[in-house]
Design a protein with these regions (language model features):
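Vicinal oxygen chelate
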Residues: 1-3, 9, 32
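Short beta-strand His + acidic residue motifs that chelate non-heme Fe in jelly-roll/DSBH
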Residues: 2-4, 22-23, 43, 49-56, ...
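Short, conserved beta-strand element in jelly-roll/cupin
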Residues: 5-22, 64
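A generic "binding-loop/recognition-motif" signal
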Residues: 8-9, 19, 28, 47-48, ...
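Flexible, glycine-rich phosphate/dinucleotide-binding loops
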Residues: 21, 29, 70
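Short acidic-glycine-tyrosine-enriched beta hairpin
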Residues: 26-45
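Double-stranded beta-helix
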Residues: 52-86
Length: 86
């Protein structure tokens, strides 16, 4: 996907199927986390992030956003570490 940063929304993910990676950068620390079934991660507001599928199986996860999504101006696309495929 395209690398993104949210202005006010925090996200929490729980991976259901597939295998992937997520890059997160909060300005002080940058990391890549492997996403496999059972993995839980958080993406605090203001954190740059980008994820990708690294298997032939769809990457499926539950995403909870808090507070509720305020509108189109919430997400800003940025330059990530991987070339987006969608």
């Amino acid at each position: 996907n395209k690398a993104t940063v949210h202005a006010t929304v925090n996200e929490f993910w729980y991976v259901l199927e597939g295998r992937g990676e997520i890059w997160r950068d909060n300005g002080a620390e940058s990391s890549i986390t492997v996403l496999v079934p059972g993995t839980s991660i958080d993406i605090p507001a203001g954190t740059s992030f980008q994820y990708r599928n690294v298997s032939g199986v769809d990457l499926k996860f539950i995403c909870i956003a808090m507070p509720p999504w305020p509108g189109d101006s919430e997400a800003t696309f940025i330059k990530g570490i991987w070339e987006p495929t969608i």
